[in-house]
């Protein structure tokens, strides 16, 4: 019987084990070691895949790496046929997650700076966006809203316009961001977000609750927001209530 302790990394340990243990016990021991090694290797790989995503880039409405295209979706050769196949916000959302590509150059063209210099640019119609699903936040929001109004008008889809503190990108001022809200079971949901394509946020008890959480996610202060029937309207709601006079 051995009274001295040997590390498992010590050659003496292996020699003692081979001398002391019967063949069946040795085989069981080495099998267990191999299983543990494989298990730890698998867990290490999985932990790398499920790492916490980085914080959102506050200077861009482009998708984050964590929201890369994933999951099944229903495709169609034309927009009209898609309207026949899709039934829900989830169908629209899955297609956006798989197909949408952010257009940084167009974002600069639609910036506050260039719009003041060159005038307004048209926002892509749903059929045009379906044929070439590249654009910016307001393009994907218009596509989702008008499509959802066709499929399920009862969920009351609306634009949600968010106004951030302005940032300057390539000398262009950016402050507004667009996505779509809808209601289900008395709760609020939000999707068609160019920052998180393929993601439906909710349920929330109120729009304000979502806006508060979204400001934290984006790392930017929201100074105003409004739910709108059209992207062309100019209504405004303060993000933080002013004290009573």
Describe every region a protein language model picked out:
Residues 92, 133-148:
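Active-site nucleophilic cysteine motif
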Residues 57-132:
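Secondary-structure boundary elements
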Residues 216-245:
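Low-complexity, Gly/Ser/Thr/Pro-rich intrinsically disordered linker/tail segments
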Residues 29-30:
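N-terminal export leaders
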Residues 142-216:
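Hydrophobic/aromatic-rich core segments of domains that either
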């Amino acid at each position: 019987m051995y009274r001295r302790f040997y590390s498992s990394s010590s050659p003496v340990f292996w020699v003692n084990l081979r001398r002391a243990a019967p063949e069946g016990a040795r085989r069981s021991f080495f099998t267990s070691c191999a299983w543990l090694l494989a298990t730890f290797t698998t867990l290490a790989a999985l932990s790398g895949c499920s790492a916490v995503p980085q914080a959102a880039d506050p200077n861009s409405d482009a998708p984050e790496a964590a929201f890369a295209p994933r999951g099944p979706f229903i495709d169609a050769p034309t927009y009209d046929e898609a309207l026949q196949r899709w039934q829900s916000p989830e169908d629209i959302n899955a297609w956006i997650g798989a197909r949408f590509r952010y257009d940084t150059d167009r974002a600069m063209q639609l910036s506050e700076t260039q719009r003041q210099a060159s005038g307004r640019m048209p926002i892509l119609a749903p059929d045009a966006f379906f044929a070439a699903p590249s654009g910016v936040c307001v393009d994907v929001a218009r596509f989702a809203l008008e499509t959802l109004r066709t499929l399920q008008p009862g969920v009351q889809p609306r634009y949600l316009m968010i106004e951030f503190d302005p940032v300057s990108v390539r000398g262009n001022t950016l402050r507004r961001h667009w996505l779509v809200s809808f209601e289900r079971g008395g709760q609020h949901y939000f999707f068609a977000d160019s920052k998180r394509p393929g993601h439906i946020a909710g349920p929330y008890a109120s729009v304000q609750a979502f806006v508060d959480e979204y400001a934290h996610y984006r790392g930017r202060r929201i100074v105003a927001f409004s739910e709108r029937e059209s992207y062309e309207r100019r209504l405004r709601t303060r993000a933080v209530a002013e004290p009573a006079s």
